[in-house]
From Swiss-Prot:
Quaternary structure (record): NDH-1 is composed of 14 different subunits. Subunits NuoA, H, J, K, L, M, N constitute the membrane sector of the complex.
Gene Ontology terms: cellular component: plasma membrane
This protein's record includes keyword Membrane: yes
Protein family membership: Belongs to the complex I subunit 1 family.
Membrane-spanning residues: 16-36, 90-110, 126-146, 170-190, 197-217, 249-269, 290-310, 329-349
The organism of origin for this protein: Hydrogenovibrio crunogenus (strain DSM 25203 / XCL-2)
Protein name: NADH-quinone oxidoreductase subunit H
Biological process annotations from GO: aerobic respiration
Keyword GTP-binding attributed: no
Known function: NDH-1 shuttles electrons from NADH, via FMN and iron-sulfur (Fe-S) centers, to quinones in the respiratory chain. The immediate electron acceptor for the enzyme in this species is believed to be ubiquinone. Couples the redox reaction to proton translocation (for every two electrons transferred, four hydrogen ions are translocated across the cytoplasmic membrane), and thus conserves the redox energy in a proton gradient. This subunit may bind ubiquinone.
Length: 354
């Protein structure tokens, strides 16, 4: 899609200018929808948790509270960013940007449809997402150190140890997907699940599906893995000294990563943009008019609801329990399942291994 735009611009502009304009439009096309979705995901979270606690949630700004995210954004932008006197001022400001940039950059390879709606359809898409998403921990560590606060530093140490621990399990879960799909291209992984719900990878990789999603909860510091910002223990964790828009940027990064994990889970395990009724007589023709991106967004919405549901349901783990779950449960399970998938690959278990 963007290649055609670049070719058209090159017909009456300098080549370098056409490339520059195309790259800027690609960045805007990726960043703007993500930021808009993040804004209203915060509203959805407050509404969902409110209903689970038998209350209304935000309902004052706009009809049904729909304009609450705009009010929150205005409030964050008009607040002062207070920089602690003894902090490292430059790193203190840079840290939120370092946390947000990887969460946004990872979206460059996420496909949204079978028609090539993707900013960069590279062959090593899975490796790119895993590598870029892991960089976000640097922003968290730097924020804790630069704040010159013991609470912030403790939260940063917790977050870094937690992310490193669960990235191993997440990486092994991705290895099993690559063994089944035989490609690291995200579009190719989705196309390998064509043929109906029984061809999706969640069936042969069911333990990996749960491991990946649980690791995603831990990676994003979401409940019940939110010890890095445990209010009852270390006030607010690594961003305890932040205020205003600098504080909001950390939340943008967290929610952008939530959406990214949901998209990756839907793409790798739940058939991406393919209909769950594909191959089912009667139902396939009834739902054939629904575009592929609608199915993808529906799956992502369900996974995001699980993020919100878990926050409202489960109590926070202790730090030692989180480490034990990552190192003594999830990693051994993933290693065992790598061997199981290898056996299924050897015997060509149909329909996933052909």
């Amino acid at each position: 899609m963007f290649d055609a735009l670049q070719a058209w611009l090159s017909s009456f502009l300098f080549d370098w200018l056409a490339v520059l304009i195309t790259l800027v439009l690609q960045a805007v096309a990726v960043i703007l929808p993500v930021m808009i979705t993040v804004a209203w995901l915060t509203y959805a979270e407050r509404k969902v948790i409110g209903y689970m606690q038998v209350r209304m949630g935000p309902n004052r700004v706009g009809p049904g509270g729909w304009l609450q995210p705009i009010a929150d954004a205005i409030k964050a932008m008009t607040k002062e960013v207070v920089i602690p006197a003894q902090s490292n001022k430059y790193l203190f400001i840079i840290a939120p940007i370092l946390a947000l940039a990887p969460a946004v950059a990872a979206w460059a390879v996420i496909p949204f449809d079978a028609n090539g709606v993707v900013a960069a359809d590279i062959n090593a898409g899975v490796l790119y997402v895993l590598a870029v998403a892991s960089i976000g921990v640097y922003g968290i560590v730097i924020s804790g150190w630069a704040s010159n606060s013991k609470y912030a530093f403790l939260g940063a140490l917790r977050a870094s140890a937690q992310k490193i621990s669960y990235e191993i399990a997440m990486g092994f879960a991705l290895v099993t997907v690559l063994m089944v799909a035989d490609t690291m291209n995200l579009t190719g992984i989705v196309e390998g699940q064509q043929g109906g719900i029984w061809n999706w990878y969640w069936i042969p990789l069911l333990p990996m599906f749960f491991v990946y999603f649980i690791s995603g909860l831990a990676e994003t510091n979401r409940a019940p893995f939110d010890v890095a910002e445990g209010e009852s223990e270390i006030v607010a964790g690594f961003h305890v000294e932040y205020s205003g828009m600098a504080f909001a940027v950390f939340f943008l990064a967290e929610y952008a990563m939530m959406i990214l994990i949901s998209f990756m889970t839907a793409i790798m395990f739940l058939g991406g943009w393919y209909s769950p009724f594909e191959g089912i007589a009667g139902l396939e023709s009834v739902f054939s008019w629904v575009p592929g991106f609608v199915w993808l967004f529906a799956k992502v919405a369900f996974l995001l609801f699980l993020f919100l549901w878990f926050r409202a349901t489960f109590p926070r783990y202790r730090y030692d329990q989180i480490m034990r779950l990552g190192w003594k449960v999830l990693i051994p399970v993933t290693i065992v399942w790598v061997f199981v998938v290898g056996v299924m690959e050897y015997f060509k278990v149909s329909p996933w291994f052909n």
